[in-house]
Design a protein with these regions (language model features):
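A transmembrane-helix-recognition feature enriched in membrane-embedded lipid enzymes
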Residues: 1-23, 55, 72-83
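A generic local structural motif
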Residues: 20-25, 45-46, 73, 101-103, ...
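Non-catalytic C-terminal accessory region of glycerolipid acyltransferases
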Residues: 98-275
């Protein structure tokens, strides 16, 4: 009930305000389970896609959205639960990944749509990163549900990471034809099969989105960017310290020169001796 109310209110407002364009809507089945595998550019991705679909789609969201303290945290948790989001622990705790897979399988077992971001996190720079093989592939192979590739277009320009107020512009959504992986049935624990399935899905997303592809994980890219920013900050601080040291040395030199110039005996001794 709450999902329907949120879709009617928030979804209608999003469509009216941003007017997202959609291609390939006919590729989403009218009924039955299916996995929507999308690139991830913005926090708003999980709202624009459900807004344009006639059916309910359940995404997994990071657990922090459900566990933040205070009134704001409780309201955020209630909102995400109300729109059908499922918490997933991304801290690397043992068993967390399997719990997320079980959640996805439960959604599909009910004959519903399950949404997942194979990159595992938002792209830090608008490029498409390598898909993580564990979640998507195992859910697809265990459930037998078709995987529908989805490309979100320009949502990172509407709400870049860290920006609260969105920019008014028109995003796009391209939905590809369903991918069938029944040929790999019973091979969900084979890591090479997991990699093959994930790469096939990522290639389909790449063709839809037109993004530049980077063959590393987005989490690794974020670490690299954070380390580079940290190094740049350290370099700036070192430069400031060096400038201060140079300034202090120049002041000391100027003071010494000034004091030498004011000394009445400086430079007169040799003249007296010559006389």
């Amino acid at each position: 009930v709450f999902y329907g109310a949120m879709k009617l209110s928030v979804g209608s407002a999003l469509k009216l305000t941003f007017r997202p364009w959609v291609e390939g809507l006919e590729n989403v089945p009218a009924e039955g389970p299916a996995i929507l595998a999308s690139n991830h550019l913005s926090f708003s991705d999980s709202f624009f896609l459900p807004a344009v679909l006639d059916r309910k789609v359940t995404f997994i969201a990071k657990a922090e959205y459900f566990t933040s303290p205070g009134l704001k945290g409780k309201l955020t948790a209630a909102f995400f639960k109300g729109v059908g989001q499922l918490p997933v622990d991304r801290s690397g705790v043992r068993g967390a990944g399997e719990a997320a897979i079980r959640s996805g399988l439960e959604v599909l077992a009910r004959g519903e749509l399950f949404g997942i971001y194979p990159e595992g996190t938002r792209s830090p720079d608008g490029r498409l990163y390598r898909g993580k093989p564990g979640g998507l592939a195992r859910v697809a192979l265990r459930s037998g549900a078709p995987v529908i590739p989805v490309a979100m277009i320009d949502t990172e320009k509407i709400q870049p990471p860290g920006k609260v107020v969105p920019k008014l512009m028109r995003p796009g959504i391209r939905i590809g034809k369903p991918l069938d992986f029944s040929r790999y049935q019973g091979m969900d624990n084979d890591r090479f099969i997991q990699r093959a399935v994930t790469d096939e899905v990522m290639y389909a997303i790449l063709k839809l989105s037109g993004q530049e592809y980077v063959d590393i994980y987005a989490t690794a890219a974020k670490r690299q960017l954070a380390e580079a920013a940290k190094a740049e900050k350290a370099a700036r601080e070192a430069a400031k310290t060096a400038d201060k040291a140079d300034g202090a040395a120049d002041e000391a030199t100027d003071r010494a020169a000034g004091e030498a110039g004011r000394d009445p005996g400086h430079g007169s001794g040799s003249g007296d001796k010559a006389a």
